Amino acid sequence: MQQPQIIELPKFSDPRGNLSFIEQENHIPFVIRRTYWLYDVPGGEARGGHAYRENQEFIVALSGSFDVVLDDGKEKKTFSLNRSYNGLYVPKGLWREMENFSTNSLALVLSSTKYDANDYIRDYEEFLKYVKR
């Protein structure tokens, strides 16, 4: 299994501002099949709370900040995202939660698969059984 990691994206700066971009299979190790974003998350609320059997993700804080907590069934690791030129690669098979959203934060999520409800593991006990196989 590949490991989660922060990937620094290209950043071009000049007096007019900054520009960053993402290229599939270059900056991220998969073809993008779905894109979604999270915004207006109320203070104290968390998102995620599931794992994927097949889907991989790349998560970028386009604005503001938040934490992504990844769990492989043995240990948890927290990644703080707060720069629009850094993203977190999340391999399949990890439980994920997103928390500590700052006011007006915007999370962009790129996915390797189209939406498939059967790919989700939404129960933590079921997830623990899944990773022990």
What are these regions (language model features)?
Residues 83-87, 93-100:
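Well-ordered alpha/beta subsegment
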Residues 1-86, 103-106, 110, 115-133:
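Non-catalytic, conserved peripheral segments adjacent to functional cores
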